[in-house]
Design a protein with these regions (language model features):
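Post-DEXD/H (motif II) to motif III coupling segment of the RecA-like Helicase ATP-binding lobe
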Residues: 25, 110, 117-186, 197, ...
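Glycine-rich phosphate-binding P-loop
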Residues: 1, 16-28
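Conserved motor-coupling elements within RecA-like helicase/translocase cores
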Residues: 58-94, 105-108
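Pre-Walker A adenine-sensing motif
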Residues: 1-9, 31
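Hydrophobic residues in beta-strands of the RecA-like P-loop NTPase core, especially within AAA+ ATPase
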Residues: 96, 113-114
Length: 204
């Protein structure tokens, strides 16, 4: 958390590179609570709304009706209702997909872009064509808000930007709560081909 705060104080957005189960969600929640306590609102971007179960449960328990959702599966009526609540500053935390970037936010203080590497932020088959990550950073600049891009496997462009000082790079290399890393085995496929005839399937 200290490194994240240092980067944000320097006026930089943050690339949070954390291995699976490293505690990214825990850090997100801390920054969300801090932002709300400071009287600002939060936009939590996801490539797919189905990825939100863990964080939704915790936020719903604490913020109730101040938590909102926006995605393509909503009806037109539901979308208008969310638009109205955002406009009237009734929603403090909005969890949504890329289309939520066009909502009339009030007093936005933090944008979290989770799974920032995901291609769903820049689909080629869905109109309008735009890169949601780039749009989110522009939105953060417009509102003078902070932005955190999180991923276990950062995109090349975000990693490059971090290494060139445009983003604050924060690496979480250990699993949260001493959760063990998965075991893996390096396989030599040149040797494997010769033995494939002797078994139904080789290790993957």
């Amino acid at each position: 958390m200290t490194e994240i705060n240092e980067g944000l104080r320097e006026g930089k957005n943050v690339l949070l590179h954390g291995v699976t189960s490293s505690g990214k969600t825990h850090l997100y929640l801390e920054k969300i609570e801090e932002t709300i306590a400071n009287g600002k609102n939060v936009l939590f971007l996801l490539p797919e709304i189905a990825l939100t179960k863990q964080i939704i449960q915790r936020l719903e328990k604490k913020y109730g009706k101040q938590l909102g959702f926006y995605h393509q599966k909503l009806t037109d009526f539901e979308k208008v209702e969310v638009w109205r609540k955002v406009k009237n500053n009734e929603i403090k935390i909005l969890i949504g997909t890329r289309s939520s970037l066009f909502l009339p936010f009030q007093n936005l203080g933090l944008i979290i872009i989770d799974e920032e590497h995901d291609a769903a932020y820049k689909p080629r088959e869905v109109k309008p064509f735009f890169n949601a990550k780039d749009a989110a950073l522009v939105l953060a600049y417009f509102y003078q808000a902070k932005a955190i891009l999180g991923s276990a496997t950062p995109s090349v462009e975000s990693y490059y930007a971090a290494k060139n000082g445009k983003l604050k790079y924060v690496f979480l290399g250990e699993r949260f709560g001493e959760v063990a890393l998965p075991k893996y085995e390096i396989i030599n496929f040149k040797i494997g081909r010769a033995s494939c005839r002797e078994r139904v399937s080789s290790p993957v």
